[in-house]
């Protein structure tokens, strides 16, 4: 079997063959029954939607891997730009570009945690206010893999769990 490759393929032929994730998906919408309004949450090229596990919420995080697809074969890990999206208006705000670890919602949907590998820090986002806070600075111990010796940012040790109904988080150090 002959495969023809182009030097500027967004996705390498071998990856196209084995990964269905890069296929274009349908855009994602929210329909508000009361106002009869349809809101675009994620365009078709944004493949990852992260939502809280609680029953009612007004925001989601979407990940856009498009800018980093050409780099996937050259970097260890898939990077994405992460946006906060209002389900009421569809407004989209860039929270972090070029992150490799996925966001984690608190169980109550009040907070989203992001690990920033280049800064070796955990950040808490409060979706309603848009406030972004470095929560690992006060810990006093590394929250990243100290024995990491690869030419990429160190991974986090991870999240141990949530307490106080999702208002407090326990991080591994």
Model-derived regions: residue spans:
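Beta-propeller folds
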Residues: 1-173
